[in-house]
A protein has these predicted regions:
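ATP-dependent carboxylate activation and anion-phosphoryl transfer catalytic cores
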Residues: 66-69, 177, 207-316
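Active-site nucleotide/adenylate-binding loops and adjacent lid/helix of ATP-dependent enzymes
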Residues: 8-12, 52-144, 149-152, 162
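Hydrophobic beta-strand scaffold residues
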Residues: 15, 43-44, 72, 101, ...
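Short glycine-rich anion-binding loops that position phosphate/pyrophosphate groups of nucleotides
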Residues: 21-23, 106-108, 254
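Phosphate-binding site of ATP-dependent enzymes
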Residues: 123-219, 242-247
Length: 316
């Protein structure tokens, strides 16, 4: 952090494009750089350090979502505690009853250690706890088990603090062979040499029969944006059950904004060229309500009109 601070003092950027997704080998620390920028009164793209910290833990997100009365699948931690939103049936304590669970890292993103083997069908909760402990022993990171919901997965990208909900995307699993889990694992997300990467595309076109579901997804995305005070850019991930009910999986307050990432795909679908999309994100970072009141707590008299910012630095 000291080296980053020295570089920022030397370059004196008008705005920083924040691309920090992890620090010290863990995504749990991704709020550190935005917090540093706030102390230096330097505007930056994306969500505030407070929002990043609040969403760093997937369990913390789920707990806040439950308190807000929003739907999220039940989950189990390795200490044996069962958590539920009260909106989805779950088995009595001690019995998983053949339910399917997905094993997830608490803090790491980008489908960390997520593959077909992450979907388990357990006879009881003790078996789920054993599976979690194996994951934690292997990786040295905390994991949790979430009830596996349905076969449809949606990503809704959020732009700006208003917020603007970009066109919803659904992951198309139709090309996967029978029996293969309908998930976006590490290979599907990050390894272009794999079958999964090339056979889990996004789609943005929906039938009229899906319109009520799409509207509900947008409503939930806005509610999540307000709940976590999201700004700049963010993404909300959902699964949909057999009854058409959407469930909030994760709130990603720092999604990847590379050209081939889901957020930029949604921006393109909304009519933004890549350069225009970047300019839009910078504009949001330099808007008075963000760069002054939220980022620094006071006005920045040297800030010109957003489009005229000449000195932008990228931190990644």
């Amino acid at each position: 952090l000291a080296a980053v601070r020295r570089r920022l003092l030397r370059t004196r950027p008008d705005v920083v494009f924040n691309r920090v997704e992890s620090l010290g080998g863990s995504d749990a620390m991704m709020a550190a750089i935005p917090l540093l920028l706030e102390t230096m009164q330097i505007p930056y793209t994306g969500c505030s350090s407070e929002a990043l910290a609040a969403t760093a833990s997937k369990l913390g997100v789920k707990e806040q979502v439950v308190r807000a009365g929003l739907p999220t699948p039940p989950w189990l931690t390795s200490d044996g505690r069962v958590h539920t939103s009260g909106q989805m049936p779950h088995r009595r304590s001690g019995s998983a009853g053949g339910e399917k669970f997905i094993l997830k890292s608490v803090f790491e993103h980008s489908s960390f250690q997520l593959g077909d083997e992450s979907i388990i069908e357990a006879a009881d909760l003790a078996a789920v706890k054993r599976a979690l402990r194996r994951c934690e022993t292997k990786t040295g990171r905390p994991f949790f088990a979430e009830q596996f919901v349905g076969k449809r997965e949606f990503n809704l990208s959020i732009l700006g603090s208003q917020p603007e909900v970009l066109p919803p995307a659904e992951i198309d699993f139709s090309a996967l062979p029978p029996g293969k889990p309908h998930i976006v694992g590490r290979e599907a997300k990050c390894d272009a040499s794999t079958f999964e990467f090339h056979h889990t595309p996004r789609r943005f076109d929906f039938s009229p029969a899906d319109q009520l579901l799409i509207n509900r997804l947008k409503e939930l995305a806005v509610e999540c944006s307000r709940l976590f005070d999201l700004r700049g850019y963010a993404r909300i991930d959902f699964r949909c059950d057999a009854h058409g009910q959407p469930w909030i999986l994760e709130v990603n307050s720092n999604p990847c904004v590379s050209p081939n990432a889901g957020f930029m795909a949604a921006m393109e679908r909304a009519g933004y060229e890549f350069d225009d999309a970047l300019a839009r994100l910078l504009d949001d970072a330099l808007s008075p309500g963000i760069s002054s009141a939220v980022r620094t707590g006071k006005s920045r008299s040297r800030r010109a009109e957003p489009r005229k910012a000449q000195n932008a630095a990228a931190v990644k």
